[in-house]
Amino acid sequence: MSVITPINTVLCPSARAGLAAIWAVPCNEVIEIIIDPLLHMVSNVILNVGVEWQRIEFEPGTAYLMQEKLIAKGYTEYVKQTIYFEEYGLSPTMRNALEDLNGNCCMNVIAEDEAGNYHYCGISVRDESELNDNLRTADGTSETGADPQTDVAKYTETLACVCDFYALITIDPIDFNPLFWTKPDDEFWTIKGN
C-alpha cells in the first residue's frame, strides 16, 4: 500500500506556481541586458533614459508563469513561456495600464513568483552578441459585469513566447538603476564615481 503525503503550505512554503507581480517594458526601450552565462542570470538591465518598469500586482491565485519544453523535429528544444493573469473589478487606472500593455507587440517582463524569486521572461540568448526578445500579448478576454447573474467585471490576459530556454533568474527590478552604473573596457560593472 502506498503512503501519500499531502502537499500543503506547511510542507511546501516556497511554491512557485503563482505570481505576485510582473514588471513590463517595451522591447524598444531596452538598451542592454547583462547576462551571466555561467549562472544563467540576468544581472542588470539598461533602459532608455526616463523609462521605468511598469508594475502590475496580482491577488493570490490569479496569475501564473508556465514554462513548457517543446521539441521540434525530434532534437531542437524550445521552451514556451506563458504568463496568464486575471484582473477583477477593473479600475480606470488598471484598464489604461492594460490597454498600454496590449499596444506593445514585443516586451520584456520580469515575473515575481509567490516565493519571491524573479524570472526574466521572453528572451533568448543565441551567443554573446545576439539576443532575441519576442514576448507579446496572446489571448485576452474581458467581461463587463453588466449581468451579475452570468459574469463579473474582469480582464484575462496571456503573454506568450517561444524561447531557447527557461526564463532566467534575475533580481528585483526596483534595484535596476543604470544611472548609477558604468561599464569600463574590462567588461566589469562599477558604481559611478568609484
Language-model segments: what does each one mean?
Residues 2-84, 128-150:
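Solvent-exposed edge beta-strands and adjacent loop segments
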Residues 4-5, 9, 24, 31-33, ...:
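Hydrophobic transmembrane signal anchors and adjacent membrane-proximal interface regions, especially
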Residues 126-194:
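Mixed-charge, glycine-accented linear interaction segment located at domain edges/termini
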